Amino acid sequence: GRRAPSGGNTQLTHFMVITNQDVLSELVTLVQEEYGKMPITENTLPYMVNIIKMSAEGKFVFNYGAPVLIVLASKPSYANNFADVSCAMQNMMLACNELELGSCWVNQIRHLQDNERIQAKMRELGLGEDEKVYASLAIGYPDLPNGLNRREIEPKGYKVTYVD
């Protein structure tokens, strides 16, 4: 991720690598508790309905039990923050794939970053006062009988327009 391109080569992305299992467990509990408090309305996206319900039941583990979580942050005032973080995330996911590791981009901390409890925990872990979380990457060994699933996935959408 640290070799990913950044706008103007600013390299402002902050990588918080969390491997401490107690800290990961705390984050899972915090995320679960805060999602579990959310109301479900007619405007709640279907995937969020499941997350909220599972959280309320104490069954939502946002990092899928992975032993590593890399949280990427940047300055909200920096115009390319999300683009830079996205480049770093993609590079790390490709590297994980090459190393036969499973990876999953998880957004729960980003979605909850204005939550006081989540914000306090992230600050305690090293998030700067002038930073916000833009993405998190869960990394671990795939829990599959034959390791990493290497199946081809057909694109479902992504409109492409060619202009000659």
Language-model features: locations:
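Small-aliphatic-rich amphipathic alpha-helix that forms the alpha element of a beta-alpha
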Residues: G1, I70, K75-K121
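Short alpha-helical scaffolding segments that buttress acidic/His motifs in well-ordered protein cores
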Residues: G1-R2, L137
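Glycine-rich phosphate/pyrophosphate-binding beta-alpha loops
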Residues: R3-G8
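Glycine/small-residue-rich phosphate/adenosyl-binding loop
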Residues: Q11, F15-D84
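Short, solvent-exposed amphipathic alpha-helical segments in soluble enzyme
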Residues: Q32-E33, S86-M89, I153-P155
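C-terminal helix-cap and adjacent tail motif
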Residues: S55-E57, L127-D164
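Short coil/turn connectors at secondary-structure junctions
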Residues: G65-V68, L101, E129-V133
